[in-house]
C-alpha cells in the first residue's frame, strides 16, 4: 500500500468459505519495542491465522521501525536520526485511512489492534484520527501494550507477581524510558499524546479490549490506561491472562496464547 513515507507492506488473511462471516475487518500490528518484528513472527502471522480461522478478515501491517536501541545505555541527547516518531504512526494512519473505505464498502466494521509496541501505535493512531476528524477504527484490541512515556507505578498486586525469579526478565522503568526515547527521537515527542496516549485526554476513543500478561511489569501501563479510558467515558474491558508473561501472543501453543485469542474472539462477536 502507498503511504506518505513510501510503500507499506501488508499481508491479508481471508477466512475460509465455510467460516461464519464476520462483521469486522481487523488490522493487526505486531510488537517489537518499536524497533524489531515483522509479518512472519507468530505475534503477527499466528494471531492473524487464528482470527481468520474464526471468520475474521485480517490485515497485518509491516510499519516502519526505528533503529535498534540499548537496554543499558541512554540514547544520546538531542534529536535522533533515522526513522522515529511520527513515522510508524503515520504508516498506521495511512493504512487505516485507506482500509476504512474498503471496510465500509464490504459492510465490515474496522477494528484496529496490536501487541506491545503495536498496541501503543494502534492507540496513538486512533486518537490522532479522532482529534483530526479522520476515519478511525470502530473498536480497539490491545495486548500487553505500553501506552505511557514513563512507566506508571505498579500496583502492590503486580509487584508481588513480578517478585523474585519472576522479576529477572522484566522491563524496568529506566528500560522503558530508553525504549520510548529511542522511538520518540526528540524529547518533546515524549509528551505527544499521539506518540504515548496514556495520561492524555482520551474522550471519544472507541470501545476497547485490553489483554495484559499476568507477570509483566508493562501491565502497570495497561492497567492505568484502562482506568484512564473509563474515566474519560470509554467502554474499556481489561483482562489479565493468568500465569502469562509478556509476549504470550508470540508463543502459539502456550495456554496463554489460546486464552488470549479466545478472549479476543468472544469480544469481537459481542457487539
Where is each model-derived feature located?
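Alpha/beta-hydrolase superfamily serine-hydrolase fold, recognizing
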Residues: 1-271
Amino acid at each position: 500500500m502507498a503511504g506518505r513515507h513510501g510503500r507499506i507492506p501488508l499481508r491479508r488473511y481471508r477466512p475460509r468459505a465455510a467460516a461464519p462471516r464476520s462483521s469486522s475487518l481487523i488490522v493487526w500490528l505486531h510488537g517489537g519495542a518499536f524497533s524489531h518484528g515483522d509479518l512472519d513472527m507468530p505475534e503477527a502471522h499466528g494471531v492473524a491465522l487464528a482470527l481468520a480461522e474464526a471468520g475474521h478478515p485480517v490485515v497485518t501491517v509491516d510499519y516502519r521501525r526505528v533503529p535498534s536501541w540499548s537496554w543499558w545505555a541512554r540514547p544520546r541527547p538531542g534529536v535522533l536520526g533515522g526513522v522515529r516518531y511520527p513515522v510508524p504512526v503515520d504508516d498506521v494512519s495511512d493504512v487505516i485511512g485507506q482500509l476504512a473505505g474498503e471496510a465500509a464498502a464490504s459492510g465490515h466494521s474496522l477494528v484496529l489492534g496490536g501487541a506491545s509496541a503495536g498496541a501503543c501505535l494502534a492507540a496513538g493512531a486512533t486518537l490522532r484520527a479522532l482529534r483530526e476528524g479522520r476515519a478511525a477504527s470502530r473498536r480497539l484490541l490491545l495486548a500487553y501494550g505500553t501506552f505511557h512515556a514513563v512507566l506508571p507505578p505498579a500496583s502492590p498486586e503486580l509487584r508481588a507477581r513480578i517478585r523474585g525469579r519472576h522479576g529477572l526478565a522484566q522491563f524496568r522503568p529506566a528500560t522503558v524510558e530508553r525504549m520510548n526515547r529511542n522511538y520518540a527521537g526528540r524529547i518533546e515527542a515524549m509528551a505527544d499524546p499521539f506518540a504515548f496516549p496514556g495520561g492524555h485526554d482520551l474522550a471519544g476513543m472507541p470501545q476497547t479490549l485490553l489483554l495484559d500478561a499476568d507477570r509483566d511489569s508493562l501491565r502497570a501501563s495497561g492497567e492505568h490506561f484502562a482506568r484512564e479510558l473509563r474515566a474519560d467515558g470509554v467502554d474499556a474491558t481489561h483482562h489479565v491472562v493468568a500465569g502469562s508473561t509478556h509476549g504470550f501472543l508470540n508463543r502459539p501453543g502456550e495456554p496463554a496464547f489460546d486464552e488470549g485469542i479466545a478472549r479476543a474472539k468472544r469480544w469481537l462477536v459481542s457487539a
